[in-house]
Amino acid sequence: MLMDLISLFLFAGVPYYLFFEKTGTLGKEKIFYLSAILVIGGLVLSNISTHTISMPIVLIALAASLFSLYKAVKTYNIYKLSYYILFFNAPMLIMFGAKESTLYGISLLLSLVGIFLMGKYYERNYGSANHRSVTGITAATPYAGLMMTIYLTSLALYPPFPNSLMFLNGILAAELNALWYIAVVIIFFGNFLIAVRVMAKTVFGKPNTNIHYIDLIPREWLIHLILFIILLVLSAVGVKELLL
């Protein structure tokens, strides 16, 4: 039972919802860093422990996941979006086997690092990480639009990006039951809903004529290109895992 609670604590955003959201003692950037570190800790723990998560904990994780989905579709802040998506995917990180959870967790974290960096780009050039008024970036800033599209498409579980391949691999490696089917449907369509909501206007909408658009500078573009290459490598790993 203790291991179950530790896994829930590390993956599902429990410290954020119980403490940091209420007190505001950490900024949005630091919350993302801390959340990512906790998830990495959970992935390490899952690889050194053979413990099977109990169904009550999975149900709690699913309930927390639905709450995170609600928060994700309500926020316009890209920093918040990055860690809400991380919390939303907690049931899969808990329910997958150690190897499958690790692969999915790594690809998820890399995609979210990309989203987080896009939040920093927004904050630096538009005054905040809020994407609501900065619409149509693909037409106005092609490089920023391309990278945002890549990260959101990966998070929406579209192949050939690694998130979808690792997600499918985790499902194929698991012993499915009714709870599994419910979790898979929630996570799959939830990720899709979150990504499409942002892409509809922010990425593919009409540019706001009141905004002076600034594209990614070469240094930023290089960082995002490296992240994209790593995602491609993970896609190859995902294909290999599916073929084994």
Language model region names:
Residues M1-L244:
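Alpha-helical transmembrane segments of multi-pass membrane proteins predominantly involved
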